A protein has these predicted regions:
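Hydrophobic h-region of N-terminal signal peptides that target proteins for export
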Residues: 11-21
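Carbohydrate-interacting regions of secretory-pathway proteins
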Residues: 19-229
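N-terminal compositionally biased, intrinsically disordered segments and leader/signal-like regions
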Residues: 3-4, 15, 36
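Bacterial N-terminal signal peptides that target proteins for export
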Residues: 1-9
């Protein structure tokens, strides 16, 4: 291992080690809030647990807050195909009002086996968070053939897949530090890559898509902006 590789590995370990502990929804766990220690370390909450404040709704999916979580209900039926088009499902997004460049981020999510969702970072096209050329999409789809949960669509596929996230509350830990991108799911690193394409943009969350529509919920969405030397 070269000295440069050692420095990169050490920086990644330091960043991941600074993620806040898991809030398990028990009494006194302060769901959707940053603790005093987290605030001193620079963490802020992107979701207040009560409203959609700080988020813009895009597309044809209804988002609500249920039991302290951002919730998108699955569509009851797909969109009927027209002409040569294929059958698709209604798709919608939440997009953060603020942009972020370099950061650590955590988010808990609940998905089903048929859920088609994703967590988007550095969305350079604010009107279209689903644009694969304008966002890094951290996929949420355990059975996806090429990019299961924790992979970045078009960048990295975590195969063979070794983490089951569906049917329970799971957690993303994300590092975006310059070109260095790290994604953990429930504490296990599934993506650790370098990619130069996108440097800044909004955070996005997806519900529904071309291949299916299942329930998705998000909570405890926290971010810590990083300063690069």
């Amino acid at each position: 291992m070269t000295s440069v590789q050692i420095c990169i590995a050490a920086a990644a370990l330091t960043a991941v080690a600074s993620f806040p502990p898991v809030a398990r929804g028990q009494a006194g766990s302060r769901m959707n809030e940053v603790t005093t220690a987290e605030a001193k370390a620079g963490w802020v909450s992107l979701f207040d647990g009560k409203t959609l404040n700080g988020w813009n709704v895009i597309g044809g999916v209804r988002w609500t807050v249920v039991d302290g979580a951002l919730s998108a209900e699955p569509a009851s039926q797909p969109i009927a195909p027209t002409g040569d088009s294929k059958q698709t499902w209604p798709q919608g997004f939440l997009r953060s009002a603020a942009n972020f460049s370099n950061f650590e981020m955590t988010a808990e999510f609940w998905s089903a086996e048929d859920t088609n969702s994703g967590l988007f970072i550095r969305c350079a096209q604010p009107a279209n968070p689903g644009s694969l050329g304008g966002c890094y999409e951290i996929n949420i789809s355990d059975p996806h053939a090429t990019t299961p949960t924790g992979g970045i669509v078009g960048v990295h596929s975590p195969l063979p897949y070794r983490v089951k996230s569906a049917g329970k509350w799971s957690r993303f830990d994300v590092l975006a530090d310059g070109p260095h991108l790290v994604v953990k799911v429930n504490g296990e690193t599934l993506t650790d890559v370098r990619d130069e394409k996108l440097k800044d943009g909004a955070i996005g969350m997806q519900a529904g898509g071309p291949t299916g529509s299942g329930p998705i919920k998000f909570r405890n969405i926290k971010i810590r902006p990083l300063k690069r030397n």
